[in-house]
Amino acid sequence: LTVHTDKPIVITGSMRPAGAISADGPINLLQAIQVARTPASVGKGVLVVLNGYVDGARDVSKRNTTNVATFDSPLVGHLGIVQDGVAHYYKASTRRHTKGSIFDVHDFKELPRVVILTCYGGMDDMVPMSVVATNPDGLILTGLGHGTIPQNVRQITQNTVFPTVRASRTGSGMVSAVPQDALAGYLVSDTLSPQKARILLMLGLTKTKNLKKLQQFFYEY
């Protein structure tokens, strides 16, 4: 979101220690280099390469604590595969990124403070009241299912002086606007996870505090 280039930016890693039987680090590093040098990788944005798959940074998530196939994009699928030393692509992100992004690290010295509040059944008022009392620059509400917020939490967090975004704890799917959001002053995360919604809101707040414009960022990025 803040690197304005069409050059491939590839992230890789390993799930097994270097001394483990069938360590995955060396092959992941090799394939990451192969992806970076593939001409078709130009303009694809930030890529994550592990276990022979190529994923877009926007949609990828870690799905398992130890499995080498931990990284996946459950909603949109892998962008491609690495085969015979070359990245083969079958889709591309339609969202703005890298050269198409308006966010610039030179525009700010530090990012706004955005916190994440995770909701659950039977949640009492203490935690949400404590979070709101700290007056953050923004708030991400991790709701149940389609970003559903418990009624008592909604009463505490609605129409705050800072932007509040509804997201979901499910790990996949879209959180879309419902009529109650306008009454509560909520934004929605679209298909971003709570963690990624936090990053986008922090960057968005470096440009504007207008709720409509902030919401548009979630539809574009």
Task: List the predicted regions and their residue ranges.
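Alpha-helix C-terminal capping segments
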Residues: 1-8, 34-38, 206
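Short coil/turn connectors at secondary-structure junctions
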Residues: 4-8, 41-45, 51, 76, ...
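Glycine/charged-rich beta-loop-alpha catalytic/anionic-binding loops adjacent to active sites
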Residues: 7-18, 182-185
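N-terminal small/polar loop signature for handling phosphorylated ligands or for N-terminal nucleophile
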Residues: 1-11, 127-133, 158
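C-terminal non-catalytic interaction/assembly regions of soluble proteins
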Residues: 146-221
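Internal gly/pro-rich beta-alpha loop/helix module
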Residues: 14-84
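Short beta-strand segments
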Residues: 10-13, 47-51, 118, 142, ...
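Accessory alpha-helical/coil subdomains and C-terminal extensions
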Residues: 56-146
